[in-house]
Amino acid sequence: MIAGIGIDVAEIDRIKRAVEKTPSFINKVLTKGEQAQLATLKNQRYYEYIAGRFSLKEAYSKALGTGIGRHVSFLDVEIIDNELGQPVVVSHPFDGPAHASVSHTGQLVFTEVILEKGE
């Protein structure tokens, strides 16, 4: 049974500017595991990854119904790409499965997260 659905859109250039202005932005948004994946990327893909994780975590918090803040932080959720490049939610505070999808087009990243609960 679906417990929550969250969607988000982020501008890649806006995230790039945030990283360039405040390099610690990465430490506030990405877990150590996500930072390890990020370290393997270059050029535009580097910023797409950061924007994608930022947006996925926003979508996750919307599916949870809380938004990012007091109940869930960016670092409470870890999303790692599997060998096929699919984002997998490997760590999160919700008691049930979480499914993530991300798509990039031009300067935008679109994300969706679905949370499931048992019947």
Swiss-Prot record:
Its cofactor is Mg(2+). Its EC number is 2.7.8.7. Mg(2+) binds at D8, E58. InterPro entries: 4-PPantetheinyl_Trfase_dom (IPR008278), 4-PPantetheinyl_Trfase_dom_sf (IPR037143), ACPS (IPR002582), P-Pant_transferase_sf (IPR050559), Ppantetheine-prot_Trfase_dom (IPR004568). Gene3D superfamilies: 4'-phosphopantetheinyl transferase domain. Signal peptide: none annotated. One of its GO terms (biological process) is lysine biosynthetic process via aminoadipic acid. Its main location: cytoplasm. Keywords: Cytoplasm, Fatty acid biosynthesis, Fatty acid metabolism, Lipid biosynthesis, Lipid metabolism, Magnesium, Metal-binding, Transferase. One of its GO terms (cellular component) is cytosol. It catalyses: apo-[ACP] + CoA = holo-[ACP] + adenosine 3',5'-bisphosphate + H(+). It is found in: Cytoplasm. One of its GO terms (molecular function) is magnesium ion binding. Transfers the 4'-phosphopantetheine moiety from coenzyme A to a Ser of acyl-carrier-protein. Belongs to the P-Pant transferase superfamily. AcpS family. This is Holo-[acyl-carrier-protein] synthase. It comes from Limosilactobacillus fermentum (strain NBRC 3956 / LMG 18251). The gene is acpS.
